[in-house]
Amino acid sequence: MDLIIKDGSRVGVIYFLMSEDNVRKETALPWMSFGSDEAAPAPQGVFLESNAHPRAYGNFAKLFATYVRADKALTLPDAIHRLTALPAANLSLKDRGLLKEGYFADIVVFDPNKIQDHSTYSKPHQLASGVNQVIVNGIFALSDGVATGARSGQFVRGRAWTGSKEGGCRATAKEWQWIW
């Protein structure tokens, strides 16, 4: 409590639970989907005083730059699938995870030869490069590498959410067919 009072904000913790060797082994498992539990702080103002985890700004860029491009631990299509359709199915997120008519238009346009993470533990507030466009719910959030200021995102809950009328925490067998 003294640390929280002295700091005047949230106190974060970074745990080192997996070796790089284990990360590479798990990356090769085809049923592993990718995600992040890190917050997305703005790299400006009061947020620059926080000690964010480097993956706050470079998690997915690191996946593409290190494990796809450099190590060839998985293919580009497999990485994209495991960042989109697979987690959407795992979390029962309706109308998400695919580029399909009637689905929410959440799209990231990047150059697979240039995408790169730059954040480190000593300098965590470094944005990734190689991402050109980000479209959230059909609206540009990043256009030609520049943030637009649009706030078109929304909180998304799958069927595992306790308030869901559908109930359940996994996609049905029928829903799984389209991801493989």
Model-inferred region functions:
Residues 1-8, 21-114:
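His/Asp/Glu-enriched, well-ordered alpha-helical/loop segment
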Residues 12-17, 91:
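Active-site glycine- and acidic-residue-rich loops that bind
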Residues 150-164:
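Short, surface-exposed, low-complexity cationic segments
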Residues 24-31, 36-37, 41, 108-154:
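C-terminal cap of metal-dependent C-N hydrolases
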Residues 176-180:
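Tryptophan (W) side chains
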